[in-house]
Amino acid sequence: MNEYDIKDTIAALSTPYSKSALAIIRMSGSKALEIASKICFYANNENKNINNFEHRKSYYALIKDENNIPVDEVIVLSSLSPNTFTSEDTIEFISHGSIVVIDALMNLLIKNGARAANRGEFTYRAYINGRIGISEAEAIHDLIDSNNKLMAEASIYKMRGRLTREIDKLRENIKNSLMLVYGELDFPEDETESFSYDKLIENFEIIKKDIENILSNSKRVENLINGIKVAILGRVNAGKSSIFNMILDRERAIVSNIAGTTRDFLSENIYIENIPFYLMDTAGFHKKADNDIELEGIERAKKCAYESDIILAVFDGSDIANEDDINLIEFLNALENKNIIYILNKSDEDKKFNKEIDNANIINISTKTKDGKDKLISALKDYVSDSDMDIFNKETYVNNRERCYLENGLKQIDICIKKSLESYSLDEVAEEMNILNNILGNVSGKVDAEEVINEIFANFCIGK
């Protein structure tokens, strides 16, 4: 971003570049009001320029070009520095969504002194001018990209500074400890009880625990917003695809009496009471595969099981348990910390399944009559506990960049603790604490890292 002058006035289309009812063009910078006054005329008095833009006011304006030819009738919204998104004077033009009008208006702004904005440059200016931090900027991008209600909510919480406040608390704690260390260094002769290595280590442990909580809570929030992974396993013709279709309430998977219809896994997203689930219908579970394709399908089914949060183990209740059923049960018993729901399918037929499953959560289902469907949906919902939703409402998520810094912060805290335990000189301990402070500062962008910042804003769309 440093290749662009922050003093420039920038303009960009904020809506898609296509024919539509309306289009919004945004302009920000010190010359925004001046440029707007050159091309904006009162719609009911086209010979009079609008040159007294007020804060948070709207104007019905006629846009005219340098030859005094009308371009469009628009709504002009004016917001004055510093109370804007960019903290700069900002003008927004709401025009008709003709590509001809969009091009003409953008060309007029550029001819009169504006510059076409770079990707994410409006958000970049909000960051540079202290309006938002890096974490908030990334949350704006996440909100734009969100594909479910929980993702949008989590992005808004983060955009409003939830993570930054947590990081600020950690850094404040470090700074308070540094003050004690520097006080001891500067006034060693003063006999006070304000400093001790034990007290310093205790404080490091608190900071460490807080970072660990941020990371672990983030994982739980991420599980919710990314979709709870549900793998459907079972032998061939147990009714896995029928269960898959029943949950979706539509015919997504091909259902057939021919063994091995599903060779690879199918996947779909579904929302149950606004909670996203990611369903995976897998290939039939065999003890012995007949060919390489079948073997690959079984391996992929196992991979889905390993990566899932919930496993739906489907058995044909109208048939005697066979070698493949027993093989599946043994596979499931070997898994650790898995939430498994056992389904006896075809409950509308005579029950013949004769294998006992110890301590199992078993649901009898008929995909023909839909009997048992409500119990299955309820069991899926029960996976999300009240504590999960409580954490979602109070905590936030971290992205890969933030997680990397937080994990590095944990390593740096261990160095601080080690040197304090071994009574290193306070100068050395203070140096390690400053490194820790800078690492955490990088999470919210309070420490400048130009290359990283440029990469973040380059991912934004133009006009944001």
From Swiss-Prot:
(6S)-5-formyl-5,6,7,8-tetrahydrofolate binds at residues 26, 92, 131, 464. Keywords: Cytoplasm, GTP-binding, Hydrolase, Magnesium, Metal-binding, Nucleotide-binding, Potassium, tRNA processing. Mg(2+) binds at residues 241, 262. Residues 227-385 form the TrmE-type G domain. K(+) binds at residues 237, 256, 258, 261. One of its GO terms (molecular function) is GTPase activity. One of its GO terms (cellular component) is cytoplasm. PROSITE patterns: G_TRME. GO terms for biological process: tRNA methylation; tRNA wobble uridine modification. GTP binds at residues 237-242, 256-262, 281-284. Its cofactor is K(+). Binds 1 potassium ion per subunit. The keyword Hydrolase applies. It is found in: Cytoplasm. It is an enzyme of class 3 (hydrolase). InterPro entries: G_TrmE (IPR031168), GTP-bd (IPR006073), GTP-bd_TrmE_N (IPR018948), GTPase_MnmE (IPR004520), MnmE_dom2 (IPR027368), MnmE_helical (IPR025867), P-loop_NTPase (IPR027417), Small_GTP-bd (IPR005225). Its main location: cytoplasm. Homodimer. Heterotetramer of two MnmE and two MnmG subunits. Exhibits a very high intrinsic GTPase hydrolysis rate. Involved in the addition of a carboxymethylaminomethyl (cmnm) group at the wobble position (U34) of certain tRNAs, forming tRNA-cmnm(5)s(2)U34. Belongs to the TRAFAC class TrmE-Era-EngA-EngB-Septin-like GTPase superfamily. TrmE GTPase family. HAMAP family: GTPase_MnmE. This is tRNA modification GTPase MnmE. It comes from Brachyspira hyodysenteriae (strain ATCC 49526 / WA1). The lineage of its organism: Bacteria, Pseudomonadati, Spirochaetota, Spirochaetia, Brachyspirales.
